From Swiss-Prot:
This is Glyoxylate/hydroxypyruvate reductase A. The lineage of its organism: Bacteria, Pseudomonadati, Pseudomonadota, Gammaproteobacteria, Enterobacterales. GO terms for cellular component: cytoplasm. One of its GO terms (molecular function) is hydroxypyruvate reductase (NADH) activity. The active site is at R227, H275 (proton donor). InterPro entries: D-isomer_DH_NAD-bd, GhrA_Enterobacterales, NAD(P)-bd_dom_sf. It comes from Salmonella typhi. NCBIfam families: PRK15469.1. Its EC number is 1.1.1.79, 1.1.1.81. It comes from the Bacteria. Disulfide bonds: none annotated.
Protein backbone atom coordinates (compact mmCIF):
# COMPACT_ATOMS: atom_id res chain seq x y z
CA UNK A 1 0.00 0.00 0.00
CA UNK A 2 1.41 3.38 -1.05
CA UNK A 3 0.43 6.61 0.71
CA UNK A 4 1.47 10.13 -0.26
CA UNK A 5 1.44 13.02 2.21
CA UNK A 6 1.38 16.78 1.68
CA UNK A 7 0.96 19.63 4.16
CA UNK A 8 2.65 23.03 3.73
CA UNK A 9 3.46 23.47 7.44
CA UNK A 10 3.33 20.08 9.20
CA UNK A 11 6.51 18.15 9.99
CA UNK A 12 6.32 15.66 7.13
CA UNK A 13 9.05 13.37 8.49
CA UNK A 14 7.16 12.94 11.77
CA UNK A 15 3.92 12.16 9.95
CA UNK A 16 5.56 9.67 7.59
CA UNK A 17 7.15 7.83 10.50
CA UNK A 18 3.98 7.82 12.62
CA UNK A 19 1.81 6.63 9.73
CA UNK A 20 4.15 3.76 8.92
CA UNK A 21 4.03 2.68 12.57
CA UNK A 22 0.22 2.80 12.54
CA UNK A 23 0.01 1.02 9.18
CA UNK A 24 2.94 -1.46 9.12
CA UNK A 25 2.09 -2.72 5.63
CA UNK A 26 2.09 0.77 4.12
CA UNK A 27 4.87 2.77 2.54
CA UNK A 28 4.40 6.47 3.16
CA UNK A 29 6.25 9.28 1.43
CA UNK A 30 6.09 13.05 1.38
CA UNK A 31 4.85 14.20 -2.02
CA UNK A 32 7.12 16.63 -3.83
CA UNK A 33 6.81 18.33 -7.19
CA UNK A 34 7.53 15.86 -9.97
CA UNK A 35 6.44 12.79 -7.99
CA UNK A 36 4.13 10.94 -10.37
CA UNK A 37 4.68 7.48 -8.90
CA UNK A 38 1.57 5.43 -8.08
CA UNK A 39 -0.24 5.78 -4.76
CA UNK A 40 -3.31 4.26 -3.16
CA UNK A 41 -4.16 7.01 -0.68
CA UNK A 42 -3.35 10.70 -0.34
CA UNK A 43 -3.29 12.76 2.87
CA UNK A 44 -3.43 16.44 2.04
CA UNK A 45 -3.90 20.02 3.11
CA UNK A 46 -4.04 22.71 0.41
CA UNK A 47 -2.51 20.35 -2.18
CA UNK A 48 -1.27 21.56 -5.57
CA UNK A 49 -3.47 20.47 -8.48
CA UNK A 50 -0.71 18.31 -9.95
CA UNK A 51 -0.41 16.24 -6.79
CA UNK A 52 -3.77 14.54 -7.31
CA UNK A 53 -4.52 15.03 -11.00
CA UNK A 54 -4.65 11.79 -12.97
CA UNK A 55 -4.10 9.51 -9.99
CA UNK A 56 -6.19 6.38 -9.48
CA UNK A 57 -6.52 6.76 -5.74
CA UNK A 58 -8.69 4.72 -3.41
CA UNK A 59 -9.38 7.77 -1.24
CA UNK A 60 -8.14 11.23 -0.27
CA UNK A 61 -8.01 12.40 3.35
CA UNK A 62 -8.15 16.14 4.09
CA UNK A 63 -6.08 16.93 7.18
CA UNK A 64 -8.74 19.04 8.86
CA UNK A 65 -12.46 19.18 9.59
CA UNK A 66 -13.13 21.90 7.02
CA UNK A 67 -13.18 20.93 3.35
CA UNK A 68 -14.30 24.21 1.77
CA UNK A 69 -10.82 25.06 0.47
CA UNK A 70 -10.25 21.78 -1.35
CA UNK A 71 -13.82 21.70 -2.70
CA UNK A 72 -13.35 25.21 -4.07
CA UNK A 73 -10.14 24.08 -5.78
CA UNK A 74 -11.87 20.98 -7.18
CA UNK A 75 -14.63 23.16 -8.61
CA UNK A 76 -12.03 25.37 -10.29
CA UNK A 77 -9.95 22.38 -11.46
CA UNK A 78 -12.28 19.39 -12.01
CA UNK A 79 -9.39 17.44 -13.51
CA UNK A 80 -7.68 17.48 -10.11
CA UNK A 81 -9.65 14.55 -8.68
CA UNK A 82 -12.08 12.17 -10.32
CA UNK A 83 -15.56 12.46 -8.84
CA UNK A 84 -15.60 8.72 -8.14
CA UNK A 85 -12.70 8.96 -5.65
CA UNK A 86 -14.02 9.35 -2.08
CA UNK A 87 -12.92 12.37 -0.09
CA UNK A 88 -12.71 12.18 3.70
CA UNK A 89 -12.41 14.90 6.35
CA UNK A 90 -11.03 14.40 9.83
CA UNK A 91 -13.97 13.39 11.97
CA UNK A 92 -13.46 14.84 15.45
CA UNK A 93 -9.85 13.59 16.12
CA UNK A 94 -9.78 15.64 19.31
CA UNK A 95 -11.47 18.67 17.76
CA UNK A 96 -14.74 17.89 19.50
CA UNK A 97 -13.19 18.22 22.96
CA UNK A 98 -11.47 21.45 21.96
CA UNK A 99 -14.76 22.90 20.68
CA UNK A 100 -16.47 21.83 23.90
CA UNK A 101 -13.84 23.61 25.99
CA UNK A 102 -14.01 26.78 23.90
CA UNK A 103 -17.80 27.02 23.65
CA UNK A 104 -18.58 26.12 27.26
CA UNK A 105 -15.96 28.50 28.67
CA UNK A 106 -17.25 31.39 26.55
CA UNK A 107 -20.94 30.80 27.32
CA UNK A 108 -20.09 30.68 31.03
CA UNK A 109 -17.97 33.83 30.65
CA UNK A 110 -21.01 35.71 29.34
CA UNK A 111 -23.46 34.02 31.72
CA UNK A 112 -21.44 35.04 34.77
CA UNK A 113 -21.07 38.54 33.25
CA UNK A 114 -17.28 38.48 33.29
CA UNK A 115 -17.30 40.76 30.24
CA UNK A 116 -19.27 43.36 32.21
CA UNK A 117 -17.01 43.02 35.24
CA UNK A 118 -13.93 43.51 33.07
CA UNK A 119 -15.47 46.72 31.72
CA UNK A 120 -16.15 47.88 35.29
CA UNK A 121 -12.59 47.04 36.29
CA UNK A 122 -11.28 49.20 33.45
CA UNK A 123 -13.25 52.08 35.01
CA UNK A 124 -12.09 51.20 38.56
CA UNK A 125 -15.74 50.64 39.57
CA UNK A 126 -16.76 48.21 42.33
CA UNK A 127 -20.33 47.29 41.38
CA UNK A 128 -22.04 43.90 41.84
CA UNK A 129 -24.46 43.24 38.96
CA UNK A 130 -27.75 41.31 38.85
CA UNK A 131 -27.28 37.67 37.92
CA UNK A 132 -28.62 36.10 34.75
CA UNK A 133 -30.78 33.01 35.09
CA UNK A 134 -30.27 29.89 33.02
CA UNK A 135 -33.87 30.05 31.85
CA UNK A 136 -33.19 33.37 30.09
CA UNK A 137 -29.87 32.19 28.65
CA UNK A 138 -30.96 29.88 25.84
CA UNK A 139 -28.09 28.67 23.64
CA UNK A 140 -28.73 28.03 19.94
CA UNK A 141 -26.32 26.11 17.71
CA UNK A 142 -26.47 26.53 13.95
CA UNK A 143 -24.71 23.65 12.25
CA UNK A 144 -25.68 20.35 13.82
CA UNK A 145 -22.88 18.06 12.70
CA UNK A 146 -20.37 16.11 14.75
CA UNK A 147 -18.89 19.21 16.38
CA UNK A 148 -22.30 20.77 16.99
CA UNK A 149 -23.39 17.62 18.80
CA UNK A 150 -20.27 17.72 20.96
CA UNK A 151 -20.85 21.36 21.91
CA UNK A 152 -24.49 20.68 22.81
CA UNK A 153 -23.40 17.75 24.96
CA UNK A 154 -20.94 19.90 26.90
CA UNK A 155 -23.49 22.64 27.57
CA UNK A 156 -26.16 20.25 28.82
CA UNK A 157 -24.23 19.73 32.03
CA UNK A 158 -24.66 23.44 32.86
CA UNK A 159 -28.44 23.39 32.51
CA UNK A 160 -28.85 25.93 29.72
CA UNK A 161 -31.90 25.59 27.44
CA UNK A 162 -30.50 24.22 24.17
CA UNK A 163 -31.68 24.36 20.57
CA UNK A 164 -30.13 23.57 17.22
CA UNK A 165 -30.88 24.54 13.63
CA UNK A 166 -29.88 22.41 10.65
CA UNK A 167 -31.00 20.98 7.31
CA UNK A 168 -32.44 17.83 8.85
CA UNK A 169 -34.26 17.15 12.11
CA UNK A 170 -32.08 16.06 15.03
CA UNK A 171 -33.07 13.89 17.98
CA UNK A 172 -30.41 14.95 20.46
CA UNK A 173 -31.51 14.41 24.08
CA UNK A 174 -32.50 17.68 25.73
CA UNK A 175 -32.05 19.77 22.55
CA UNK A 176 -34.93 21.38 20.66
CA UNK A 177 -34.46 20.87 16.91
CA UNK A 178 -35.36 23.39 14.20
CA UNK A 179 -35.12 22.73 10.48
CA UNK A 180 -34.85 24.85 7.35
CA UNK A 181 -35.49 28.49 6.58
CA UNK A 182 -39.14 28.20 7.56
CA UNK A 183 -38.17 27.49 11.19
CA UNK A 184 -35.19 29.83 11.43
CA UNK A 185 -37.12 32.80 12.84
CA UNK A 186 -38.63 30.73 15.65
CA UNK A 187 -35.17 29.36 16.42
CA UNK A 188 -33.56 32.80 16.56
CA UNK A 189 -36.30 34.58 18.52
CA UNK A 190 -35.48 32.65 21.70
CA UNK A 191 -31.70 32.30 21.23
CA UNK A 192 -29.67 34.39 23.67
CA UNK A 193 -26.31 32.93 22.63
CA UNK A 194 -25.87 32.00 18.97
CA UNK A 195 -23.04 29.53 18.28
CA UNK A 196 -22.07 29.10 14.64
CA UNK A 197 -20.70 25.71 13.55
CA UNK A 198 -22.06 25.68 10.00
CA UNK A 199 -20.10 24.21 7.08
CA UNK A 200 -18.86 26.68 4.49
CA UNK A 201 -21.14 26.32 1.47
CA UNK A 202 -22.65 28.65 -1.11
CA UNK A 203 -25.85 28.63 0.97
CA UNK A 204 -24.17 29.62 4.25
CA UNK A 205 -21.81 32.41 3.12
CA UNK A 206 -22.91 35.67 4.75
CA UNK A 207 -25.73 34.01 6.67
CA UNK A 208 -24.99 35.96 9.87
CA UNK A 209 -26.15 39.32 8.57
CA UNK A 210 -28.43 42.15 9.69
CA UNK A 211 -31.58 40.23 8.76
CA UNK A 212 -30.59 37.27 10.93
CA UNK A 213 -29.22 39.35 13.81
CA UNK A 214 -32.41 41.44 13.98
CA UNK A 215 -34.34 38.27 14.83
CA UNK A 216 -32.29 37.57 17.97
CA UNK A 217 -33.44 38.93 21.34
CA UNK A 218 -31.97 42.28 22.35
CA UNK A 219 -28.70 41.84 24.19
CA UNK A 220 -27.79 38.56 22.49
CA UNK A 221 -24.31 37.16 21.93
CA UNK A 222 -22.62 35.61 18.88
CA UNK A 223 -19.87 32.99 19.02
CA UNK A 224 -18.37 32.16 15.62
CA UNK A 225 -16.35 28.93 15.55
CA UNK A 226 -16.94 27.96 11.91
CA UNK A 227 -15.76 30.22 9.08
CA UNK A 228 -15.26 33.96 8.84
CA UNK A 229 -17.21 34.20 5.57
CA UNK A 230 -20.38 33.25 7.44
CA UNK A 231 -20.41 36.69 9.10
CA UNK A 232 -21.10 40.02 7.47
CA UNK A 233 -18.66 41.88 9.68
CA UNK A 234 -20.16 45.34 9.04
CA UNK A 235 -23.59 44.05 10.07
CA UNK A 236 -22.13 42.45 13.20
CA UNK A 237 -20.45 45.71 14.20
CA UNK A 238 -23.66 47.66 13.57
CA UNK A 239 -25.60 45.24 15.80
CA UNK A 240 -23.01 45.66 18.55
CA UNK A 241 -23.10 49.45 18.29
CA UNK A 242 -26.91 49.54 18.42
CA UNK A 243 -27.09 47.26 21.46
CA UNK A 244 -28.90 44.49 19.60
CA UNK A 245 -25.82 42.38 20.37
CA UNK A 246 -24.15 42.60 23.76
CA UNK A 247 -21.00 40.79 22.69
CA UNK A 248 -19.25 38.67 20.10
CA UNK A 249 -16.47 36.12 20.33
CA UNK A 250 -14.78 35.40 17.01
CA UNK A 251 -12.23 32.71 16.23
CA UNK A 252 -12.44 33.02 12.44
CA UNK A 253 -12.51 35.91 10.00
CA UNK A 254 -13.23 36.63 6.36
CA UNK A 255 -9.56 37.56 5.93
CA UNK A 256 -6.85 35.85 7.98
CA UNK A 257 -4.67 37.12 9.53
CA UNK A 258 -7.16 39.87 10.37
CA UNK A 259 -5.87 43.17 8.89
CA UNK A 260 -4.61 45.70 11.42
CA UNK A 261 -7.08 48.29 10.13
CA UNK A 262 -10.11 46.11 10.91
CA UNK A 263 -12.42 47.81 13.43
CA UNK A 264 -12.94 44.41 15.07
CA UNK A 265 -9.57 44.83 16.80
CA UNK A 266 -10.71 47.95 18.60
CA UNK A 267 -14.35 47.23 19.39
CA UNK A 268 -14.80 46.94 23.18
CA UNK A 269 -17.40 44.17 22.95
CA UNK A 270 -15.55 41.97 20.49
CA UNK A 271 -13.19 39.28 21.77
CA UNK A 272 -11.15 37.17 19.40
CA UNK A 273 -8.66 34.36 18.98
CA UNK A 274 -6.53 33.57 15.89
CA UNK A 275 -8.38 30.52 14.47
CA UNK A 276 -7.34 28.15 17.25
CA UNK A 277 -10.69 26.88 18.55
CA UNK A 278 -10.01 23.35 17.29
CA UNK A 279 -6.71 22.39 15.70
CA UNK A 280 -5.57 19.10 14.19
CA UNK A 281 -3.97 16.90 16.84
CA UNK A 282 -1.56 14.64 14.95
CA UNK A 283 -1.76 11.50 17.10
CA UNK A 284 -5.55 11.44 17.05
CA UNK A 285 -5.66 12.27 13.34
CA UNK A 286 -3.32 9.38 12.56
CA UNK A 287 -5.45 7.04 14.65
CA UNK A 288 -8.57 8.03 12.68
CA UNK A 289 -6.85 7.84 9.29
CA UNK A 290 -5.17 4.49 9.92
CA UNK A 291 -8.39 3.01 11.28
CA UNK A 292 -10.41 4.26 8.32
CA UNK A 293 -7.88 3.02 5.75
CA UNK A 294 -7.92 -0.41 7.43
CA UNK A 295 -11.72 -0.46 7.23
CA UNK A 296 -11.67 0.58 3.58
CA UNK A 297 -9.17 -2.15 2.75
CA UNK A 298 -11.47 -4.71 4.40
CA UNK A 299 -14.55 -3.36 2.62
CA UNK A 300 -16.14 -2.30 5.90
CA UNK A 301 -18.45 0.73 6.29
CA UNK A 302 -16.75 3.99 7.27
CA UNK A 303 -17.75 7.48 8.36
CA UNK A 304 -16.40 10.93 7.56
CA UNK A 305 -16.87 10.86 3.78
CA UNK A 306 -17.57 14.26 2.25
CA UNK A 307 -20.71 14.83 0.20
CA UNK A 308 -19.29 16.99 -2.56
CA UNK A 309 -22.72 18.18 -3.68
CA UNK A 310 -23.61 19.45 -0.21
CA UNK A 311 -20.12 20.80 0.45
CA UNK A 312 -19.43 18.97 3.72
Amino acid sequence: MEIIFYHPTFNAAWWVNALEKALPHARVREWKVGDNNPADYALVWQPPVEMLAGRRLKAVFVLGAGVDAILSKLNAHPEMLDASIPLFRLEDTGMGLQMQEYAASQVLHWFRRFDDYQALKNQALWKPLPEYTREEFSVGIIGAGVLGAKVAESLQAWGFPLRCWSRSRKSWPGVESYVGREELRAFLNQTRVLINLLPNTAQTVGIINSELLDQLPDGAYVLNLARGVHVQEADLLAALDSGKLKGAMLDVFSQEPLPQESPLWRHPRVAMTPHIAAVTRPAEAIDYISRTITQLEKGEPVTGQVDRARGY
